[in-house]
Amino acid sequence: RRARYKKEPVSLTLALLLGGLTMGGIAAGVGTGTTALVATQQFQQLQAAIHDDLKEVEKSITNLEKSLTSLSEVVLQNRRGLDLLFLKEGGLCAALKEECCFYADHTGLVRDSMAKLRERLSQRQKLFESQQGWFEGLFNKSPWFTTLISTVMGPLIILLLILLFGPCILNRLVQFIKDRISVVQALVLTQQYHQLKTIGD
């Protein structure tokens, strides 16, 4: 009876220790999963916002290029009209007695740059979609479900591992403690035996 009474606090202590570790592991898993999910979602939101902003900048620059082209056509048309009016004087520049200015059209460069930007945006979008894992792609339409699965999966794996390997580890630990207790008992008995032997001699 005494040996059993001594073992119960050890078993109770081990059970409390493993239970505490399990709950701590679950809490850590929930915290880690939630933090990783929030950080990933924030990164994806930032990436999507940058992508949208770049699209808007591209549209704005394209519209400015079209406006500049239209304005340059108006200016050139006015110049031709003024040259016709001042034809007798040798044209507008001769009438003003100034050096003539000529229009250099660089809107083709802007058009090319915008085409390259559109192409890079398209490539980034395809790359972003291809880098999404099957898990994110599967649950991309319902973020609450992704959050739930990501948060619960870590603790469930920890619990499964504890259920699989916990009994084996607990048995090994109990056996180790039993062996140590047996060694201590043997040492105590041999110590008492030596004392009795010296008293009896």
From Swiss-Prot:
Extracellular side: 1-148
Entry coiled-coil feature ranges: 39-75
UniProt-annotated stretches for the region Fusion peptide: 10-30
Regions of this protein lying in the Cytoplasmic compartment: 170-201
GO BP: any one term: fusion of virus membrane with host plasma membrane
Site (Cleavage) location in chain: K7, E8, L187, V188
One GO cellular component term: membrane
Start and end residues of each stretch annotated as Immunosuppression: 76-92
Free-text note on domains in this protein's UniProt record: The YXXL motif is involved in determining the exact site of viral release at the surface of infected mononuclear cells and promotes endocytosis.
Protein name: Envelope glycoprotein
Organism of derivation: Kirsten murine leukemia virus (KiMSV)
